[in-house]
Structures are given as C-alpha cells and as structure tokens.
Amino acid sequence: LSDGEVNATSRGLEFAPPPASFPVPAIDTSGLDLRSFSSDGVAVILSEAQADLTGRERVSTTRLVRAVTGHDGLQSVARFDPVFDPRFERLVIHGVRVIRNGVARDEGRPEAFEMMRRELNLERAIYDGRVTAHMIIPDLREGDIVDCCYSVTGEQPSLRGAFSWFFILQWSTRTVETICRVIARPDQKMLMRRYAGAPAPRVGDSNGRRIYTWRVRGGDPYLPEPFAPAWSVGFKAVEIGFARSWAQIADLFRDMYEGAISDGSPPTELAAEVEAICARTSDAAARVVEGLRLVQQTLRYHAVAIGEGGFRPRALRTIWSTRYGDCKDASVLLTSVLRQMGLEASCALVNVGQGADLHNFIPSPRAFNHCIVRLRLNGRDYWLDGTRPPQSGDLAHLTQARFGWALPMIPDATLVAIEPPPLTVIREVVERWTFPRDAARAARLDCSTTSRSWRADETRRLVENRDLSALADLYRDQLERDLNSNLREISPMAVEDSASANSVTLRESYEVERAMVPISSDRRRFVSFDDIVRPNLPIIDAGPRREPIALGERRRAMTHREFSFPSTVYFPPWDETIRGPGGLEARVSFAWLDRRRGAHTVSLTVPTEVLAPDQAGAYRTFLERVFNQGAVAFDLRIRNGRLVDAAGGGQTPWGAIASCVVITLLVAARCAGGG
C-alpha cells in the first residue's frame, strides 16, 4: 500500500536537523582505498547509531555513509528505507546527501518519499503495522558517496522504562568505522554483555548525562559458520540495557495476562467444553491433554502485533469468540482451560531459537519472542504450546515445548530451566530384503518406518494434510534416489497411528529392479544406503572451528535390515560400537539368523544438542568412522543367471562384507576436504 500523495508530516514523517547530541561531521575519505573495503560494489565508510534515553521520549538516531565503488552497488545504495511504527513513533529525516567530487546535494525532500505498509511476515499470518518510508535516490553514479541520517522518536508503550539494545561491531563485510553510543542519566544503571571480544565502552559524563561510546575502525569481517546454533554470536557485538531483574520483567506483563485470563466468567460454550472433558475422565493428566487439544483444534493462528498487540494478549472472551489468535492468546486460553480444571497453570515467556542461551541474556522484555504455558502437576513442570497443530500422545508421550529456559509470569519470577526430554528412538526403520534365485528378477523390499515424539507429530501432519497416494509417491521417489533403482509398488502405503504412545508407522512394499549391480560376469553386488548419519548429523568443513556445532534435538535413530538369500552365504558377523565427543555413539552390527538370513543393524545416539568448537576434530573422526563402517556391501555368485551357493557347499567364506569401500572412501574424502 502507498500513500505518496499525502502530506509527509501527517504521515509521521518529519524533516529536521540531527539532535544536538549527534554531531554529523563531514566525511573525509582522503587516504582511504575504498575498493579495499568494497563488497558487491559498495564500501561502508561509517555505520553510526545512538540511543538517547535522557529526554521525555527515547530518540534512536542512525547514520549510514556508503560509497558506490562498482556498478552492482548502484541499486542497493540508491534505496533508503527506514522503518517505524506510526502509532507510537515518529520518523525524522535529517538528510539524504549525495557527495560527488566533494560537492554535496540533499535529496531528502518530503515529495521524494512514499509511505508503504509492508507486512514482511504476512505469509506467517503476522501483522505488525510498521511503515516503511521509501525513496529512491536519483542520479546516482559510480564514485558517489551517499550519507543518510535519521531518527526514530518514541517507543512501544508497553515497554516504557525497559530499554535494551543489541548492536553489532563486526560486520560480514569490511567497514571503515563503526560507532555505537548510549546516552543515559547517571541514575540509569546499565548492564552489559560483550560478545566475541567486543571492546569495552569509553564512558564519560557531560552536562548531567552519562555517555557510553564504542568505536571500531577497520577490522576483519566475520562470516557465521554453518551448523552453528541460532544463539551463537561469533562476531563482535554488545547487548546493553537497564539493570532489571527477571522478576521485574515478568511484572511488566503479568497483569496484562492475568487480566485477559480473568476476563469475567469464562464464556458459556468454553465452560461447557471444559465440563465435558472433566465428565469424560477423572484423570488429571488425561484432562490436560484433552484441554490442550481443545485449544489447538479451536484456535487458528493469526497475529495482529499492531501497537500494544505485539505484547498484550486479547481478552479471553474475544479470543474464544473469534477463534483465532497468536501465541499470547493461545496461552491465555489454555491457561484458563487448565485453571477451570482446578490445575496450576501460568503463561510463560520463551525465546524460539535462542532459548538455550537465555540465562546469559540481560533481563529484558525483548529477550522473548514466544509464549507457552507452564503446568505444575504432581511436583513437576510440563511445558505446553497451544499454537502447535493438534498433538497426539498421552501426557507422558506428548511432545512438550522445549526452548531451553522460560520465564513464568508469576510473582517473584525467575528463569526456569526446561528439562530436556528423555532419549527416544524418534525414527526406526525395519527393512526386509528378499532376493530371488533368478538374478534377472527384481528383489522384494518390505519397509516399515516408525516415527515417535516430535517426528511422529511431523509425520502425522504430512499424512493429514495431503493425499496418501501423493505422500507414497514422495517416499517412493526418495527411496528410488537412495537405491538408484526403479521401484514398483506391490501394495499401497499403509499408516498405523498409535495416538496414546505418539508413534506413527508407515508400511511400504516394493519390487526393486536393480537391487544388485553386476561387478563381473559371475558376480552381483548389493550396497546399502546411509539413512542414519547424513539425515541426522551435520557435515562440517575441515579446519579450525570458532562456533559451536548444532546437532539438533537429543534423539536416537535406528535402521534394521534383514536379508533373505536364495543360496547359502557366509561372512564373519561383527558388532562394533563407535564413540564420539559429547556422548555421540553409533553401533553397527551384522548377525546371522540362519544359513540364508542375516541382519544388519545401525543405531545412532545423539545425547547432546551442541558440541563445543574444540570438539570439531573428534566429531569429524567420529563421522568418518561411521561412514566407513555404517553401511553393508556383499557380493553374490551367479551361474547361468542364477544365484548359487558358495563353493564347498557354503563352508568357504566367499561373501565380501565390508565398509562399502568405494562409497565410503568418497565420503571420507569429501568430509576431509570440507565439501
């Protein structure tokens, strides 16, 4: 949406000189080789930001000075797109100056701007009401320097008195100079957290103000490493905020949530639903699960984070009558349902993505981006998320919300550690291979895949939201790629759902056209594929590691393959356990069930979510060993187109079972080379 014809001032856009506290000296690039700082045709000369907390309203001022060093930089530098929320903020443009050959012109005129409401999270059903003041700088050429300066005045009403700011001092491209500044009153006590060796501020007092200044010149750029956890900050950065306790942060929101929950008596229809659940079962755990599903089935996710809506839940009656809401609304509704059952429940704030590091954050309302419910039952905590699709499982098997730490909105609140779930086999595959004596015929593969816990939730959602035949096609296509063979379906995919245990089993049966490949005129070879390591563990580059390695949820995975041969086969069985850092463990075994049937089992245990950077070498060694020993390959002899027994009636070992030599050597080389 655009309203370019409306007067700029009436749209929350103003034009004025920069604040007196924010000097704007002329840019001097003499002696600078800007191309040495250039990336994609742009050199960043100055990135400066300031937060002034001393006035009646908070003022955040930004200055960005960039040079166009190549044609590719023209488009990005020509765009100027400051964002603000017109409901409680004002945008003040201080200047949009183009400097060419030492001569400056100001393009920051009211008629140059269009006000656009760009809902960046529209596809996620989130509306925040922020506005972009958009302009394209005209007549921009290579060699020009663009100097943009603006302020945003005001703050979210719900967060007044709760300042916090995270800023970056080391960018992904070289920057000539970065300056960040906080101006506060001496009585405004601050807490600071510095990341990756960020410098301490220079602190000075002037005219009754305390000024904290960080200044960094040059320095190497920083590129985040792949497979680092979301909470990892490997670049120089600083978090600063008012000295507050977690209890004070909870108190900011507690009355809002309690007011929404106790919005008069519960709606009649909602109360009737809760009474019906209580009439069906007297077991508290069973009531909890039914209450959670009631919320998950009733509420459609839709977030209107406009104004205070980003922090304040709607009233219970409104939530129930509209049947939609965001995480705050879902938590209010679920807390009400559980309390009507006579249970102890409260809303709790969490951080999706960075929750594991939350206990190291400076206490601040901006430390959180999600809301769930904490249930206290029989002396333990349960963490429930009303925004998830309807979940299966009794309370013991239900997938709980796991975000590291949570802040319950109760009096005298403190952060509470969310205990990790018990180690569970979340994926178990059983394959039964039957090889015909006629080498030209297809082998038969019967496969069952059992998913548990959160993996079962994902599988169940796939089954419920698409045609089963289409889902079967997806699974078959993937298996054809893994086996490098065409498959013919023997029977349709079947689904077995154990709702209380929260497990889903998919059963498939195929004829495998090329189960074995010729390696000579009288031999065929079978090679299994890796469905354990690569789908479950990240493959990291070689060389030193700076950031932790994210392994994902704690879990176990297992594949069991049974082979039925038409002839007598023998090779030595084995059973080996491979251990890695952080408790990683893989077990690989082969055992004979009888003279013509063998079983190959591979299991992987991941008991930790993160490895430290100094464990990278041991982790690579673990991966290589599992690659080299985790698969199975064997050769079968052919005579006149038929599989035959081993020489000497099967007493002579002729079968070759090994480490999929060709495949794993390639994998090991790729791992060592960082590919």
Language model features: what each stretch is:
Residues 5-668:
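A sensor for short, sequence-defined functional sites
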Residues 668-675:
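Juxtamembrane boundary at the C-terminal end of a transmembrane helix
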